[in-house]
Each structure stands twice: as C-alpha cells, then as structure tokens.
C-alpha cells in the first residue's frame, strides 16, 4: 500500500502515469500536508461515522488519499472519477483494497 500522506510519493505516482493536474476539470487534490497528515484522514473518516457495514460513494477520489482511509472502514467503496487519466492511478494506489470499485463517470450528467 502506498503512503499517500507523503507528497513525494503522490508526485512519483502521478509522474509515472504521466498525469498532471487539470484546471479545466476543476481538480483540487488533497495534497496539503496539514490535511494528508497520517492522523487527519483517518480522523475525517472516523468523524463521518462510516462503519464496516456501510457502503460509501466517493465523488472525485483524485489519487485515492481519502479513499484508502474510507476503504479501511467501509464494507464497500464506489469511487466515481471523471478524469480517465486517473483511472490507472487509482488502480495503482488502491490495488490492496478488494472492497473498492473505481468507475469512470461524470456524476453531473
């Protein structure tokens, strides 16, 4: 499992897949060190009240920073990502989670 709380790890993964951020898609990835701190994302999920019996739909998982934490708690996670370039990135970063399904979709349509 990748440590997605490390900005350099995220940059390496993005670079390996040839992905850059797209302002046209309004992409805002969680890369602020204060937010992706190893203790903050688990706390966000804890505060959400997600349990092992819950299914979660995540819209715009980005590179999967929060998705990993949700997958550790939820029974099933369906992550809907608009940007086709991020699908292989998510397959890479979420490969250790068999309870995550990534779907390339535009939820606004």
Report the location of each language-model feature:
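Catalytic cores of RNA-modifying enzymes
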Residues: 1-109
């Amino acid at each position: 499992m990748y440590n997605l709380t490390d900005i350099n790890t995220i940059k390496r993964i993005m670079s390996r897949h040839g992905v850059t951020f797209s302002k046209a898609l309004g992409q805002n990835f969680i890369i602020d060190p204060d937010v992706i701190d190893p203790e903050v994302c688990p706390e966000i999920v804890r505060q959400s009240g997600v349990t092992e019996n819950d299914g979660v739909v995540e819209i715009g998982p980005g590179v999967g920073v929060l998705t990993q934490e949700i997958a550790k708690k939820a029974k099933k996670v369906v992550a809907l990502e608009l940007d086709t370039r991020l699908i292989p990135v998510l397959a890479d970063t979420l490969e250790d989670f068999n309870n995550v399904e990534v779907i390339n979709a535009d939820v606004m349509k």
